A protein has these predicted regions:
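Short amphipathic beta-strand segments in non-cytosolic proteins
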Residues: 44-47, 54-65, 89, 123-132
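Periplasmic N-terminal accessory/gating domains of Gram-negative outer-membrane beta-barrel systems
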Residues: 67-71, 90-110, 121-246, 276-282, ...
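A short, solvent-exposed beta-strand micro-motif common in secreted/extracellular proteins
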Residues: 80-90
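Transmembrane beta-barrel wall of Gram-negative outer-membrane proteins
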Residues: 252, 284-366, 381-410, 583
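Gram-negative outer-membrane beta-barrel transporters
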Residues: 552, 683, 687-837
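Solvent-exposed loop/turn elements at secondary-structure boundaries
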Residues: 577-579, 587-742, 857-860, 873
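C-terminal beta-signal and adjacent terminal beta-strands/loops
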Residues: 683, 696, 701, 818-858, ...
Length: 950
């Protein structure tokens, strides 16, 4: 065997002699390795996102790199303390000392790394996705990511509806048609703040979003409910932030068309609104149609330096409307058009300097074309138009250890109710038959409300890393608004009631103003004696400082102090509210690689709706005053006196507002949270948070001339105002007042809840978010126009809040298969909202008319009947979407169908509403009496769409 010739006997003998020595050496090495210890852990960014490619090294020893889940395993020597160092590009390095480990032992640890400011434009336009664990702070709330925004069923492409799936957020019960639809922690929806990329997006007069943002331009919807950073202010409840989409490294875009065909695809509503005949209401449902068109485009305007994105959405719908009287039924129509536009350009001047230009606007118009007995010429159009234009500049220095973000924004808003076809040179006329039953309304509309707002905002936030453990943030925010309001409680040309004695002709049951003869019999004439122009301002100022302290690599403590000032508190008889200091403290402890313990405590100041100031002027001593002339005092048709012709000292007593006669303060909440998050494997996490909120200084209406009469056990019928006037401190007289009201800050609400949430994220395949909120909200006021039913006894009004629901369970899911099929859905279950029993709208104390009751529905109750003492039935809503992608060349065509209220469940609560008076939530009688349902959530509705994406 020549190939083995080198193995001589002598060499084989030497090998066998060396074998025991080699075996002993191998055993020693194996023993040494068995005696070694291991360090196992997870490295995360401060946000909680696992960090891949982070280097973990024993100083003077071995090192390793984290995997895609941020995990690592490192063998270390035993019997002595070791220094471990963690580094990763774009983050502050961190070090810690490991205690001596025993042979074969294992040490588990979790670390977070503080990010450096990375302002290269590529980083600005590519923000990271939401992590399973929040390792940064104790803020509660949640996020709806971009992939969910575009896949989940969304009626009317309204992103606000998706916010209802976030813990602590629910559908709001408002008090006017355009009331904000989102409530946080059972509070009034007026106090929820809205931002776009951190900048103000609030309609300042009352509240709610200034700009209706296009869904196609939205990258992420975030809600901060509790224990959030001192950087955010002006709300005692929470903040809704729209994060806008940016252009990427390649051009992408979409064009889409949506259609809501209505009946027969939609189900018919089984609830007929009060006053309408079922057959007429069913016929009106046949007239609904909606079409939506739009698109979005984005990409590199100049690769590596400039990126842009823009979106445009248009909606057109019509709704047939039928209102019935005992004598006449007419088919009417409302035409609705909405435009939404948004655009953003990001430009990188250098790796440390980036500028963003941002623009958004929306214009919503609802044009009434007549309804019931209202002729088209007498109907109104509702217009809500808002815009924002802003610039943000980001800069960094010291290698990203210091940074600054400065932003300037100009915003506008208009809310107007002009006549659809006519002008205010024509009065409104109500035509009565011989039995005094209205049979027609012609002429023009019967009120003026034209409000405009212009706002400048400047915001600056600076951040400095002070060594390894401290990150200091400080900033200020100023928003200056000017408002213009033209308001009149009637048509400037007056409002007539005339009787048709056979001398007013009609065509097919329709009447026209031009056909009313000059000698028609006038039953009454009503005019606002003092139409009002209110041009005032509001200034909001905020300053904050916050230290993010990391005493260990797993523990983050945020200690902040914020100060806010609303200069409305300095108007009238009030003194400036300058003591709004808000200390905030939160902890976030990464106790184990997959376990976070968090908690927070702090104070949160809100701002006042501008309307509390404007209303006090508009309805003040020199403000609006409506007067009616009847019978012999009624003028001839067309010859009624105008406001300038009236002697106000001869007019009957009314309600007059005083400007903050008792002083006013900004709303302030104290909040406490405590919770734990647990990662379940690589793709899931669960959390439980306890929340407590105590909100004080809520504005409400106070009567400075309150009557002393109270409701007794035997009171069951209405009494004249003269009875109530006798118990007022100042007896009402001609030219004076009956109620002398002011807005004051004695309102209080409390909220206690438990948020339980589960999240499963399989990236491109399945995303599931589910939560259960168990809570209780109590309040003694519901709105700025909330009045006590008896004098100023607000203790008797303390009850479950209008937006309280004890249980709310929500789940949303998006599942994308490998064959282009995407299915998604939302399920929302909640217990019923409170129901308020009133005494058949009777005036049991002779208090007279009260401004605000028509909005809120808090009319007088029978003796012993508590406010909101009963509940509407629970609600269950399920929405579903099915989409299929077809590849066409290098693009994709998506065909999609969506169904809302899939099971066609009849829900009497659990849906956003802005019905004045409360709808079904306001019932007459006493507890246990039958409930009459006049409103309900929409029945099953179907929406179809097609989209082309490239």
């Amino acid at each position: 065997m020549p190939a083995l010739g080198f193995l001589t006997r002598q060499r084989l003998r030497r090998c066998f002699r060396a074998l025991p020595l080699l075996l002993s050496l191998w055993s020693a090495v194996a023993a040494a390795q068995g005696d070694a210890a291991r360090v196992r852990g997870t490295i995360r960014a401060q946000s909680g996102r696992p960090l891949a490619d982070a280097r973990v090294a024993i100083i003077g020893g071995d090192s390793t790199v984290t995997d895609g889940q941020g995990s690592f395993v490192l063998r270390v020597a035993t019997g002595r303390a070791l220094a471990l160092r963690v580094t990763r590009a774009g983050h502050v390095p961190d070090s810690l000392v490991l205690p001596p480990l025993l042979a074969g032992g294992e040490h588990r640890l979790a670390l977070t790394l503080t990010p450096l400011a990375q302002l290269a434009v590529q980083q600005v336009v590519a923000p990271p996705s939401r992590p399973l664990l929040n390792a940064s702070d104790a803020a509660t709330g949640g996020v709806v990511e971009g992939v969910e925004l575009r896949a989940l069923p969304t009626e009317g492409r309204d992103p606000i509806a998706l916010g209802f799936t976030i813990p602590g957020v629910a559908q709001a019960r408002g008090f006017f048609g355009d009331a904000p639809r989102l409530s946080i922690n059972g509070g009034n929806s007026l106090y929820t703040q809205y931002t776009i990329d951190g900048m103000d997006n609030n309609e300042g007069f009352l509240g709610g979003p200034r700009v209706e943002f296009p869904l196609a331009a939205l990258a992420r919807l975030e809600v901060l409910a509790n224990s959030y950073s001192a950087e955010f202010g002006r709300s005692p409840s929470g903040v809704v932030n729209y994060e806008t989409r940016t252009g990427g490294e390649r051009w992408t875009g979409e064009l889409f068309a949506y259609n809501r065909p209505g009946i027969p695809f939609d189900a018919r509503s089984p609830i007929v609104p009060g006053g309408e005949r079922p057959a007429d209401f069913r016929r009106a449902q046949d007239g609904f149609r909606r079409t939506q068109l739009g698109g979005g485009w984005g990409g590199p305007l100049r690769r590596g330096t400039t990126y842009g994105f823009g979106a445009l959405e248009y909606s057109n719908e019509n709704q047939d409307r039928i209102s019935s009287t005992a004598r006449a039924t007419f088919l009417g129509r409302e035409l609705r058009e909405t435009w939404k536009v948004a655009g953003r350009i990001d430009h990188g001047w250098s790796p440390d300097q980036t500028t963003t230009l941002r623009f958004a606007m929306s214009h919503a118009s609802r044009a009434g074309e007549g309804s019931g007995i209202v002729a088209p010429e007498a109907d109104i159009t509702t217009i809500r138009a808002g815009s924002i234009s802003g610039v943000t500049h980001r800069s960094a220095w010291r290698g990203g250890r210091s940074s600054n973000v400065a932003a300037l924004q100009l915003a506008t808003y208009r809310w107007d109710f002009p006549p659809t076809r006519s002008s205010f040179n024509t009065p409104q006329v109500t035509i009565l038959d011989r039995d005094s039953i209205p049979i027609g309304i012609v002429g023009s509309s019967n009120f003026i409300f034209d409000e405009q707002e212009l706002q400048w905002q400047f915001r600056d936030v600076m951040e400095h890393h002070l060594g390894r453990a401290h990150t200091l943030r400080a900033g200020f925010d100023v928003a200056l608004s000017s408002f213009q309001l033209t308001g009149s409680s009637t048509n400037p040309s007056g409002s007539y009631e005339v009787v048709n004695t056979g001398n007013i002709p009609s065509v097919n049951g329709r009447y026209r103003f031009a056909d009313i003869p000059s000698d028609v019999f006038v039953r009454s004439y009503t005019i606002d004696a003092a139409q009002k122009q209110v041009d005032l301002t509001q200034g909001l100022y905020g300053v904050f400082v916050e230290d993010r302290w990391r005493p260990t690599s797993a523990l983050t403590i945020r200690a902040g102090l914020r100060w806010d000032y609303d200069d409305l508190t300095s108007r009238g008889e009030s003194s400036a509210d300058l003591d709004n200091l808000q200390p905030r403290l939160s902890i976030n402890w990464l106790a184990l690689p997959g376990t976070v313990v968090r908690g927070g405590v702090g104070r949160f100041a809100g701002k006042l709706p501008y309307a509390v100031y404007s209303d006090a002027v508009q309805f003040g001593p020199d403000g609006n005053q409506t007067v009616t002339f009847r019978g012999a005092q009624a003028p001839r048709f067309g010859q009624g006196p105008r406001a300038v012709d009236l002697d106000r000292s001869a007019l009957p007593p009314r309600e007059i507002r005083e400007l903050f006669a008792l002083g006013i303060e900004q709303p302030m909440s104290s909040q406490l949270t405590l919770g734990v998050q647990q990662q379940l494997g690589a793709r899931a996490s669960a959390s439980v948070d306890l929340v407590w909120v105590d909100t004080r200084h809520l504005p409400r209406s106070w009567d400075l001339n309150a009557q002393g009469r109270r409701i007794a056990a035997g009171d069951s019928v209405g009494v004249p105002v003269a009875v109530g006037d006798a118990s007022r401190p100042v007896t009402p007289v001609t030219g004076g007042y009956r109620r002398l009201t002011t807005t004051e800050s004695g309102g209080r609400s409390t909220y206690a809840g438990m948020y339980t949430a589960l999240r499963y994220d399989l990236t491109e395949t399945l995303v599931l978010d589910a939560n259960w909120v168990w809570s209780h909200a109590i309040s003694n006021t519901e709105d700025i126009n909330f009045n006590a039913t008896q004098g100023n006894d607000f203790d008797a009004e303390r009850a479950d809040a209008n937006n309280d629901r004890r249980h709310k369970v929500t789940a949303r899911a998006t599942w994308r298969t490998l064959r282009g099929l995407t299915m998604s859905g939302i399920v929302d279950y909640q217990t019923g909202m409170p129901l308020n029993r009133v005494a058949f709208f009777r005036d049991l104390t002779g208090s007279g008319g009260t401004y605000g009751d028509g909005f809120i529905g808090n009319y007088q109750r029978f003796f012993g009947v508590p406010r909101n003492g009963e509940r509407l039935p629970s609600a269950l809503l399920a929405n579903a979407s099915v989409a299929y992608d077809l590849r066409v060349g290098g693009s994709t065509v998506t065909v999609r169908g969506e169904a809302f209220n899939v099971f066609n469940r009849l829900n009497y609560s659990g849906f956003p509403t802005g019905l004045g008076g409360g709808g079904s939530a306001t019932q007459v009688g006493r507890p246990g009496d039958p409930i009459t349902y006049t409103t309900a959530a929409p029945p099953r509705q179907v929406q179809f769409s097609v989209a082309w994406r490239y």
